[in-house]
Structures are given as C-alpha cells and as structure tokens.
Amino acid sequence: MDLFDRINKLKEEGLNEIKQAENQKMLDKIRVELMGRKGELTEILHSMKDIAPENRPKVGQEVNQVRDLFQKQLDEAKNNFLQTLIAKKLEEEKIDVTLPGREGHLGSKHPINIILDDLESYFIGMGYEVVQGPEIETDHYVFEMMNLPKDHPARDMQATFYIDEENLLRTQTSGDQARVLEKHDFSKGPLKMVGPGKVYRRDDDDATHSHQFQQMEGLVIDKNVTMSDLKGTLEMIAKHVFGQDRKTRLRPSYFPFTEPSVEMDVSCFNCDGKGCPICKYTGWIEVLGAGMVHPNVLENAGVDSTVYGGFAFGLGLDRFAILKYGISDIRDFYTNDVRFLAQFRKEED
C-alpha cells in the first residue's frame, strides 16, 4: 500500500470514527489518535523522508487537507454534543411560568423588640435620652461606681461572668448610668435617660431563668426630684404597658445604688388581684425595682449630692413580655419557632 492509499484509508476510517462517537470523551480520544503528537497523521508526515522529493509537496498537501477535514468534523461533533447537553439541561430545569408563585411568608417582630420599641418611643416622648453602653464592662462601672466597692456583701447577689479580674459581662445596665452621670453638664439641664440592653448572669436556664436577658434602666437627676416623681413615673410605665386599669403598689426593698429602694407590683393579670397560683395567692406580681439614687453614686460620678438628686429604675424586658403576653416559658423567646413568633404580628401595629 502506497502512502496515498494509506492517507485515503485513514481519512475514511477517521471520519467514520468521528461519526460514531457517542460523547465528548470519545471524541477527545479520537482526536489524539488521529492528530496527536503520536497520531497517525503525524506518523505519515514523519515517513515523508522515505519518499521521492518530488512527491513530498503532494503528500503534504493531502495530509493537510485530511487534517483540516478531521478538525472540521471534530468541531461539528463537539458543537452537536454541546447543543444536546444544553437542550437536556433546559428540559430538566425548565420552569412552568403558568404555575402560581409561592406565597411569601410575612415576618414579625420579636415580642421583646415590640416591648423595647414601645418603651423607647414612650420615654423619648417624655424627654428621655436613649443610651446604649458596652456589654463587656469593667468592674469599676458596673459595681464600684454604683456603690458596690470590692468585697461589698451585696456583690454576692450578682452571679457574674468575669472575663478577667477587671472586665466582665455586665450583670445590669447600670454602667450606662455611671458613664452618663460622669459626662453630663447639669448647667444645660436635668439628666433623663433610659439604657436598654442585654445583660448576663450565671443562672441555670429553665422556664423562668436565663443566663442572658434584656433589661432597661432609667435615670432622672435634677434639683428637687422626689419620691412622688418616682411613684408617678412607675405608675405611668405600668399603665402604659399593662393597661390603664392595672393597679400598682410599692414595697420597701434593698438595692445598693438607691436609698430608699422599692419594688413595684401590679395586680395579677390572671385573677385581677383576687389571688391565684400564678400570683401565689397574693393578688400581686412583681415587675420592677427602683429607688432614689444613693448619694454615693452621685458623688462617685462627681455630682454634688447636696444639690442634685433623683431616681432610678430597672425593668426586665423579658419579664414585661412574659407578663403582657402570658408566656409560660422564657426559653420560647430564643428557640426561633416561627409559630410562636407569628402570633405577635398584630402587636406591631
């Protein structure tokens, strides 16, 4: 068989193999066998040294024509495979535009955020400033500035997460009060602020306790602020959140940063003050603590306690939400159950 017969036979067999290829992988293998560095066309070119010089141009021309033909057929086959693949993918992933769209799920605010936003708006309307301090606080601001020096026995009331000897996760937002007191210029007017935020205590999580909860503390400092001002403010808060018919009472208590100190109760939501298991048959439920700011707290912040005085209060936003909405387990706030959260959508209006 001469070289021209070999070229023609290779052309016929090569075109047939390309035609019968079933996928791109087979096509790539055929390309290498026909046109690769060790392919059959390359071998023919290498064998041209054994033919007469006058025939070499013609053989080279034949080889190039066959190479171009192979390349054309390979490209066409590759394009066909690609089109088939695209068509298959479109068929598998097609969207029926006549189907109705999926209904969107309307979100809702978290019940604690509903309480928080409502109280912030309420206090802003009464001229209070909303202040937020750091959650990682210093012992100085959380305790010492609030009349709780080191080794004070009342520190045992606080189950604290200490980061190191000086820094801690705040157990209350009172540190915000101390920071504002230090900087406030009383020549420009009285101080009225609320400080909401997360606080942390080493409690075991159960239906009524959590190691993390949200608190809001309030502070009013001016000349001639009295206990009557505090009582009126607390009553307004209770009636705003729990309803105008809710009865309130103050009981003596103890907090290191206030003197005198009180706790406020509201009439039981379940029995309306008649007595039931929820209120332990007292007719009352505790909602917050408060008192007149201790002179030491003022002096620690550089405020003359003989000229200025005021009151402070602290309330648990989680507790307010539990009482207002009748929630039995505080853990419901943090389990992200959309069925639980959806029921508060109407409360946002």
Curated annotation (Swiss-Prot):
Binds 2 magnesium ions per tetramer. GO terms for biological process: phenylalanyl-tRNA aminoacylation. Gene3D superfamilies: Bira Bifunctional Protein, Domain 2. InterPro entries: aa-tRNA-synth_II, aa-tRNA-synth_II/BPL/LPL, Phe-tRNA-synth_IIc_asu, Phe-tRNA_ligase_II_N, Phe_tRNA_ligase_alpha1_bac, Phenylalanyl-tRNA_Synthase, tRNA-bd_arm. The keyword Protease does not apply. GO terms for molecular function: ATP binding; catalytic activity, acting on a protein; magnesium ion binding; phenylalanine-tRNA ligase activity; transferase activity; tRNA binding. Keywords: Aminoacyl-tRNA synthetase, ATP-binding, Cytoplasm, Ligase, Magnesium, Metal-binding, Nucleotide-binding, Protein biosynthesis. It comes from the Bacteria. It is found in: Cytoplasm. Its cofactor is Mg(2+). Its EC number is 6.1.1.20. It catalyses: tRNA(Phe) + L-phenylalanine + ATP = L-phenylalanyl-tRNA(Phe) + AMP + diphosphate + H(+). The keyword Disulfide bond does not apply. Mg(2+) binds at E259. Its main location: cytoplasm. One of its GO terms (cellular component) is cytoplasm. Coiled coil: none annotated. HAMAP family: Phe_tRNA_synth_alpha1 (MF_00281). Belongs to the class-II aminoacyl-tRNA synthetase family. Phe-tRNA synthetase alpha subunit type 1 subfamily. Tetramer of two alpha and two beta subunits. NCBIfam families: pheS. This is Phenylalanine--tRNA ligase alpha subunit. The gene is pheS.
